[in-house]
């Protein structure tokens, strides 16, 4: 079924432009409400958001649609995406909804859904909801006036999530004596995450905790970890933690100010799990974007890496299918399935710090486990998105690049699921070769898809 609304991580776009207009979002909620409503019992939907000013628009549009569909709405206010995933389970809600465009600027916003277990919706379910939105009609079977829903504020939602996060750390572990630099990107975690680390004993130097509705992700957070890295070195802190706007991803810096991406964090955590016999089948799940060095690392330590398409939802789907408990993305989405059903930047940082404490090692020493192969990624603006195989010039250029690499590297081309971009990635052990191949491929893609 064709799905024109949803991308790789829900609905996303510029505020007040299709599909992020109030009428489309209201119909989306109405469609989702009719999909999840089952029988005559009262149904519940949990709605959270990040700190964008436009969140108010979509909060009310969603509430209107869900109430019209006969569902009771519980509003959490600004809260991380993984908190909504957790609270959907905790509240026994039928569905959870997050209003956020994640790491995008404040001019964008988005909508993503979680099922009653806190998992992101499969493609097929999103397609069904999208089809009903596009086919909106006055004869939808809506409840009578006595059975429409009501809206409530869930005042204790941050506290519930706080307790959940602290319970992911054993009682014999605390962060007394550790100093951290924490960047919340002026986003959804600006209140709850600093509080969690402080209650666990850490001294927290906070940045990105003053949202004004328009400064989310503005040269802060996981896309700009250089600020955290610099401050860690200056403050002689033990670790720097940079979250994105909805706090479902994390990038860290060691005590020397060196930045670690999701692959390096996965290597540290996967080895710890393997050493404790807590990684079933010694299997780590990551995406096609993860560095080849991670694959080599897992093999060298008796494990294996399973790759999926880009998107933490696909990582989670593969983990569930394979019985895996840990996986993630190079971008910093990290999923500890024994604790959470989606990527959680705060939880991932807690697990990493737990390893530092238990091993008694600085992060810089743990980071030596993985030395990523040189990799270059170029985002190429495109006017159209056709299969790369249907562009002869691109196909020929890729074959030439792969022949040059001779199995000692990788070429990956894919489209962004949310923007008009083609992503060109090349990696190999020869940095100069990576640079030249990636630049030439990007030029070919730009000409072919202009």
UniProtKB/Swiss-Prot annotation:
PROSITE patterns: PGM_PMM (PS00710). The gene is glmM. Its cofactor is Mg(2+). Its EC number is 5.4.2.10. One of its GO terms (molecular function) is phosphoglucosamine mutase activity. This is Phosphoglucosamine mutase. Pfam families: PGM_PMM_I, PGM_PMM_II, PGM_PMM_III, PGM_PMM_IV. The keyword Magnesium applies. HAMAP family: GlmM_B. The lineage of its organism: Bacteria, Pseudomonadati, Thermodesulfobacteriota, Desulfovibrionia, Desulfovibrionales. PANTHER family: PHOSPHOGLUCOMUTASE (ALPHA-D-GLUCOSE-1,6-BISPHOSPHATE-DEPENDENT), PHOSPHOHEXOSE MUTASE. It is an enzyme of class 5 (isomerase). The keyword Phosphoprotein applies. Binds 1 Mg(2+) ion per subunit. Catalyzes the conversion of glucosamine-6-phosphate to glucosamine-1-phosphate. One of its GO terms (cellular component) is cytosol. It comes from the Bacteria. Mg(2+) binds at residues 102, 244, 246, 248. It catalyses: alpha-D-glucosamine 1-phosphate = D-glucosamine 6-phosphate. Activated by phosphorylation. The modification Phosphoserine is found at residue 102.
């Amino acid at each position: 079924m064709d799905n024109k609304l949803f991308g790789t991580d829900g609905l996303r776009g510029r505020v007040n432009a299709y599909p992020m207009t109030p009428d489309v979002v209201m119909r989306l909620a109405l469609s989702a409400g009719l999909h999840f409503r089952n029988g005559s019992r009262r149904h519940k939907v949990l709605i959270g958001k990040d700190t964008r000013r436009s969140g108010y628009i979509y909060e009310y549009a969603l509430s209107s649609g869900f109430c019209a569909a006969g569902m009771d709405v519980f509003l959490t206010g600004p809260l991380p995406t993984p908190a909504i995933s957790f609270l959907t389970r905790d509240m026994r809600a039928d569905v959870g909804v997050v209003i956020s465009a994640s790491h995008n600027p404040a001019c964008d916003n988005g909508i993503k859904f979680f099922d009653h277990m806190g998992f992101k919706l499969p493609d097929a379910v999103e397609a069904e909801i999208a089809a009903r939105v596009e086919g909106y009609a006055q004869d939808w079977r809506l409840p009578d006036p006595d059975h429409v829903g009501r809206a409530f504020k869930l005042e204790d939602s941050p506290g519930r999530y706080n307790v959940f996060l602290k319970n992911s750390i054993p009682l014999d572990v605390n962060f007394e004596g550790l100093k951290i630099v924490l960047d919340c990107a002026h986003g959804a975690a600006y209140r709850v995450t600093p509080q969690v680390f402080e209650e666990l004993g850490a001294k927290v130097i906070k940045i990105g905790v003053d949202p004004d509705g328009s400064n989310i992700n503005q040269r802060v957070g996981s896309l700009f970890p250089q600020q955290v890295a610099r401050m860690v070195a200056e403050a002689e802190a033990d670790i720097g933690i940079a979250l994105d706007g909805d706090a479902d991803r994390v990038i860290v810096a060691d005590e020397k100010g060196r930045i670690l991406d999701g692959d390096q964090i996965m290597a540290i955590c996967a080895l710890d799990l393997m050493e404790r016999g807590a990684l079933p089948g010694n299997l780590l799940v990551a995406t096609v974007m993860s560095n080849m060095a991670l694959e080599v690392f897992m093999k060298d330590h008796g494990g294996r890496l399973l790759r999926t398409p880009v998107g933490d939802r696909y990582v989670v789907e593969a983990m569930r299918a394979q019985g895996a408990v840990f996986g993630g993305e190079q971008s910093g989405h990290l999923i500890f399935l024994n604790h959470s059903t989606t990527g959680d930047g705060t939880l991932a940082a807690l697990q990493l710090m737990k390893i530092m404490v238990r091993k008694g090692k600085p992060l810089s020493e743990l980071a030596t486990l993985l030395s990523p192969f040189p990799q270059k990624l170029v985002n190429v603006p495109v006017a159209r998105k056709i299969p790369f195989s249907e562009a002869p010039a691109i196909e020929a250029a890729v074959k030439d690049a792969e022949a040059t690499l001779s199995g000692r590297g990788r070429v990956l081309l894919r489209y962004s699921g949310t923007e008009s971009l083609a992503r060109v990635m090349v990696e190999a052990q020869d940095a100069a070769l990576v640079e030249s191949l990636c630049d030439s491929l990007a030029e070919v893609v730009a000409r072919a898809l202009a």
